[in-house]
């Protein structure tokens, strides 16, 4: 419940700024970027816990599929709505898009047991290694990984210009842990 209240307050402040009532730099100010990171982390960590509990209680694929379809459908609505509001920075892989993909991967990797701790650690660290490599020795590859068709993986040398960006990596690591 606390994450929902925090997200609501955050978005209220974002809306005030977007409408010009309270100018803030939500893209660069550490006060806002830190809160965004914490809120997304809480949501994904709780989603991972929820998946673990659901599997422990024997949740079948049919129920999972219905819940997943709701999340994926809402992600599509977010993309459509943001395209009208922010045509140059619409949301094509935000928190709901990421959660839809991550929930499928979490469901498929549920039998990994303790290996999920290692996989989660790798998922958390891999983007930093990719950023270093794509900014240095593998810079020629950056154009591909930074493109929209691959940047949803999170292996980028620079973040894309979009209103919300929650790539698969490192966030899958948060959901797995």
Model-assigned labels for residue ranges:
Residues 1-177:
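Alpha-helical transmembrane segments and their immediate juxtamembrane cytosolic regions
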